From Swiss-Prot:
SMART domains: LIF_OSM (SM00080)
Family: Belongs to the LIF/OSM family.
Residues making up the signal peptide according to the UniProt record: 1-22
GO cellular component, one term: extracellular space
PROSITE patterns: LIF_OSM
Protein name: Leukemia inhibitory factor
Primary location class: secreted
Function: LIF has the capacity to induce terminal differentiation in leukemic cells. Its activities include the induction of hematopoietic differentiation in normal and myeloid leukemia cells, the induction of neuronal cell differentiation, and the stimulation of acute-phase protein synthesis in hepatocytes.
Naturally occurring in which organism (per UniProt): Bos taurus
Pfam families: LIF_OSM
InterPro entries: 4_helix_cytokine-like_core, Leukemia_IF, Leukemia_IF/oncostatin, Leukemia_IF/oncostatin_CS
């Protein structure tokens, strides 16, 4: 495994972040002061809403592209194989304060970014010629990275939050082919479900 960031990488990150589609999402160190690299734009919440809307509008087509690329038995057994039963997924409470919702959004986006990295890595091996799927996964990961950066900027500039504890989904590298496909399908089913809620909440 290649360590993509210089310096000491937290053990949790090493164990669970195997992001094959690019560099890791930025995770703020525990001792970081609340300072952003660039001033936050004045329309930051609009950008966050737009990014959530963009992700929501493309989530279903990504899900369809994914399960179609896996072949049988996935397209005809979606309820069984792709149900969004992701037990360790971070919670979201739409009726919380803006600060609480942004912290939960940050956790969800970090979780999804790491999971998409695993899915992308697996799909490049399992379905090397599914270029449309690879491209869609990569585009989604790029938007997630931008969204994560914007959420952190808002948390830092308005609420002085410099660190959010995050968790990651299961690492798929030791799973068999079918389990990799199934976990990816379940995760994208959950992503489609939760991104619709998030888009409404902001």
């Amino acid at each position: 495994m290649k360590v993509l960031a210089a310096g000491v990488v937290p053990l949790l990150l090493v164990l669970h972040w195997k992001h094959g589609a690019g560099s890791p999402l930025p995770i703020t160190p525990v001792n970081a002061t609340c300072a952003t690299r660039h001033p936050c734009p004045s329309n930051l919440m609009n950008q966050i809403r737009n990014q959530l809307g963009q992700l929501n509008s493309s989530a279903n087509s990504l899900f369809i592209l994914y399960y179609t690329a896996q072949g049988e038995p996935f397209p005809n057994n979606l309820d069984k194989l792709c149900s969004p039963n992701v037990t360790d997924f971070p919670p979201f409470h739409a009726n919380g304060t803006e600060k609480a919702r942004l912290v939960e959004l940050y956790r969800i986006i970090a979780y999804l970014g790491a999971s998409l990295g695993n899915i992308t890595r697996d799909q490049k091996v399992l379905n090397p010629y599914a270029h449309g799927l690879h491209s869609k996964l990569s585009t989604t990961a790029d938007v997630l990275r931008g969204l994560l950066s914007n959420v952190l900027c808002r948390l830092c500039s308005k609420y002085h939050v410099s660190h959010v504890d995050v968790t990651y989904g299961p690492d798929t590298s030791g799973k068999d082919v079918f389990q990799k496909k199934k976990l990816g399908c379940q995760l994208l089913g959950k992503y489609k479900q939760v991104i619709a809620v998030l888009a409404q909440a902001f």
